[in-house]
Amino acid sequence: MKKFMALAVAALMLVTCLAGCGGSKDNANNTAFKIGGTGPLTGDASIYGNAAKNGAMIAAEEINAEGGIQLEVRYEDDVHDPEKAVNAYNTLKDWGMQLSLGSVTSKPAEATSASNFEDRIFALTPSASAVAVTSGKDNVYQMCFMDPNQGTASAQYIAKKGLGTKIAVIWQNDDVYSKGIHDTFVAKAPELNLEVVSDTTFTKDSATDFSVQLADAQNKGAELVFLPMYYRPASLIFAQAKAANYAPKWFGVDGMDGILTMKGFDTSLAEGVMLLTPFNADATDERTKSFVTKYKERFGDVPNQFAADAYDCVYAYAQALKAANATPDMSAEDLCSKMIEQFTTMTFNGLTGTNMTWNKDGQVSKDPKGMVIQNGAYVGLD
């Protein structure tokens, strides 16, 4: 009986060991690095998620065609919802994800980045810009500007270009992306002799009627209205401002990129809207022209900065993997250590910036580009 029990315990230990080593056993047969991301592929924010997915796919195809390292990229739909994002992340983890593109939008990314940190799966998000995405997580990095940096940079740009001194701000107070940009903008404005004469808010549930906010801005003589928000509420603001015969200067942020391809939107309403973005689809360098041409041919749209940032994420991974002499049979945890070492020391040139670097907190250093919408297209201001 004792002998039988000993054999049973030994067998159980063997099964447990094999189960615990399953990740590395699966990776042993990998011929490509598995890179996963979540984003809104359906729903109101789907322009962002599909753009990121499309940009990442083009980059992976180009890198694979070179015949060196091979990449397999997979995206799961999170519908811009934190709970669904975690479920999507777990699906990717079960698939064998070794490296992550995080989540496309900030609130879901706050949830999935916690899982990235706990699981030691390195993440490089193209566009989730909230501070909480990377804060306290040594293995979560951003290709995009952080929200506070966008707020500060927007205030500096408005002041430097003399776009107006009396400013109204309309922002969404239950959205971390909007709040983060708003808070640093209004903090920086007084230093630059910008007077915030109107500071009004809305929520996700009230994002249909902006008459009160627009009336407040107009009555207080705002020359420029700053809109730190995504494109959908902005599209309603532009339409309602026109109906109210209010025509200030408009200044947005990178979340507004995508408004020109929004279904049913009259692009003439966005004429003259200015924003800061890291990517200009009309740039004349060969790499940008090639990317834009491929994107148009494949997907029928002009790529926005979400597509370009995701494209850059995949190329940054390729550069880091080559420099680290990494191989697809490595565990996610081993790759995580190598990526931290590479990203804190390397310099990267991409579509969205040159000589990009990252600090130990995962924040990227690159310069934004001023853009204005003219005749239904983005045109460089600088």
Predicted regions span which residues?
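An alpha-beta-alpha
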Residues: 140-201, 224, 317
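Short, low-complexity disordered leader/linker segments with a strong preference
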Residues: 1-34, 65-68, 382
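Segments of small-molecule ligand-sensing domains
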Residues: 297-304, 318-378
